Every structure is written in C-alpha cells, then in structure tokens.
Amino acid sequence: MVVNSDPDWLWRGTAEIFPHNADSNNPQEHLGILTQQDRPLRVKLGIDPTGTDIHLGHSIPFRKLRAFQDAGHTAVVIIGDFTAQIGDPTGKSEVRKQLTADQVKRNAESYLAQLKPILDFDTPGRLEIRYNSEWLSNLDLNKILELLATMTVGQMLAKEGFAERFQKENPIFLHEFLYPLMQGYDSVAVNADVELGGTDQKFNIAVGRDLQRHFGKTPQFGLLLPILLGTDGQQKMSKSLNNYVGLQEDALSMYSKLEKTPDRLLGEYFELLTNLDLAELPENPRECQKLLAKEVTAQFHGVAGAIAAQKTAEDIVTQGKAGNTDSVPEFSLAEITFPVKLAYLLSASGLCPSSSEGRRQIKGGAVRLDGDRLEDVNQEYADPKMLINKVLQMGKKKFIRLIS
C-alpha cells in the first residue's frame, strides 16, 4: 500500500501538481516523495519585470518558493529580462507592449527589493537569481528553429488568449509564439526540477516539460497556485482594477485594506497569505479580518509596524481620533450636491483651500478615506451613503468626519 508522504507545506494553497501519481512510489512520478530525497531540488519561478510594483497576488508563488527554501531546496528565480521585452501573451486579448532593456532593468531592481521580506536571500545555497538573457540572447537561428519545430501552430492556438484572439480575428504576431518556448527553454537552461506558477501558467510549464524531454533532461514537475481574488471579491487582484494591496504600501494603507476583506475571502486569504493554522482561526469574522490585516502587514512592516497601523486605524474609524488628536471635526454632506468629486469635497470640507490643491494632494498620495489611500484624481461619489460616518484625511494631521 502506498502511503501519501506529501508534506503539509507542499499542498497548502496548491491548486494542482502535475504529474502527480498518488499510486506510485517512484520519485520521478511523485513530487511529495522527491522533496524528501537527499538532494535539494531546483525550484524555478520566473517573473517578467513589466512594471515597478508587486501586489499580494504576485506574492503567492513566492511564498510557496520560500516554503521550498525552508525545506532545504534551492529557489531559482528567473528574471525575464529577455522575455519581458516580448511580454507574456497569457490571458491577453491583444498584443503586449514591448519594453526597452533599460525599463526592464529598472523594474527588475524594484521587484527584487520588494521580494526581500518573502524570500531567504541570506542562507547559502538557498537562492539563485538568474537573468534569462544569459542564454536566450545567445540563441542562434538553428537553435530557434529547433525550438519552433517542437510545437505546432494548432498547439499554440489552443493556448488561452491566442484562441480568443484568433476567433475574434485580432492580430497574433509571430514573436508571441516564441514566448512559451522561451519560458520553457529557461527550465532547460537552469535544470529545473519543479516550476511554480499560477493556474494560468499550466500551458507554459508543460512546454518546459516537453523541451526538457526533447533535450534529454528529466521533465520538471509543475506546481500551480490559485489566482488571488482582489479586495472587491469579484475579479483577480489587479492594480488596474484598484482592488489590490501593494507590497510597497505603507503599513496603515495595507492594514486598512486587508481589514475590510470580504468574509467569504477570509479562508482563502489566510491560506494563501499566511502560515497560520487554519483550524485555530477566530470564529468571529471581524476578529478574523483584524488578525489577517495584522499578520500580513507584519510580514512587510514588522510586528511593531502592524501594531501601530492597527491602533491608528482603530483610532480613526472607531474612536474618531488619530494619533494624538483628541477629536475630529465634522462636515455635513447635506451642504454639498451629489454627485461630487473627491477634489471638490476636500475643498468644501475645509481640508484644503481649493479643488486644484485637492487634486495635487491626491496625486501626491496624501488623501485617505478610513485609512485607505485614494489615488484617482477623478474619483467621484454618486451618493452620500458611500461616505457617511467615514473619516477623510489629508496629510498626517488633517482629519474630518463626514456625517449626513
């Protein structure tokens, strides 16, 4: 009888491992067994630095990568400085804008700085950081033709994103077909035993397995992780949808956003974003929200920073005060006409002298509502119910409570 020897950390928050033959004692067919062999595994995770910011959704595969590190394995982080100039077409309904080498370099530096609270950068042998331009920029035409010959156009068109664009007769450029092959060749170049990715990366990871087999190497395992829903509970976390929590956000902003996590997302967030025992969580959803906010904020700002953020958030929302301010003045929303622009509200409430100054403060990141930073200079509120009993803040010392 085969006993499931998978360690708990391997499956926590994991959507799928492939191949995963639970009836086999062969390590080459069972990642759980392979993780407990004598040699450390080489666990690959690639990122294309297409922007400067990482949010909690991006952090999930890196948290799993850290779990592999803590179990004694080697994390191989691939900075896709070459592939970022193409852009991953996965899930995209149109061609991605190509980046310059300088843009990619700056973005990569920002990404690595944000990952330091998550990954183990210090223990010898636990982390390799590689740039795929090391090998991809040296591919000659013969090698590129060899890669192209491993797949058919039909296989490529079956990929999510390509299929939709083909059906809608939207253009698909030939260089985009190279992306999965290049990501797959990364696995060949670094001798990956395991590749991590979101559930949307299964096609690309499977291509890596095929290419490793083509070049006479042992095919990697794929470990897929869920795509995190955003704080709205509706769509995947995304900066463009403004439902994200950025890793570079200050402690108060991070805490305030997470404290409002919808009840139905709490279990998922605890499983994917913390190491807490899920069986020991508070029964009260409100207490769960506070615990989640405090736990995640502490990962990036330390325990002291999380405690301070919690106290400030509670002072603003529940006690009507902030820091050393004993009370907050009130402004009646009945004095203005709705819909109302945020910039005008800042001026009408007396927090700033004019709407133009209000827009400048919003652009500068100085405006918050109940602790949440507001960044859209065109933000508009259609109904006073959206604002009643909330605290509007500008800078560190100016607060006003909005009442009916």
Swiss-Prot record:
Belongs to the class-I aminoacyl-tRNA synthetase family. TyrS type 2 subfamily. GO terms for cellular component: cytosol. Catalyzes the attachment of tyrosine to tRNA(Tyr) in a two-step reaction: tyrosine is first activated by ATP to form Tyr-AMP and then transferred to the acceptor end of tRNA(Tyr). GO terms for molecular function: ATP binding; RNA binding; tyrosine-tRNA ligase activity. Its EC number is 6.1.1.1. It comes from Synechocystis sp. (strain ATCC 27184 / PCC 6803 / Kazusa). Residues 340-403 form the S4 RNA-binding domain. Coiled coil: none annotated. The lineage of its organism: Bacteria, Bacillati, Cyanobacteriota, Cyanophyceae, Synechococcales. It is found in: Cytoplasm. ATP binds at K239. Gene3D superfamilies: HUPs, RNA-binding S4 domain, Tyrosyl-Transfer RNA Synthetase. This is Tyrosine--tRNA ligase. It is an enzyme of class 6 (ligase). GO terms for biological process: tRNA aminoacylation; tyrosyl-tRNA aminoacylation. A motif ('KMSKS' region) lies at residues 236-240.
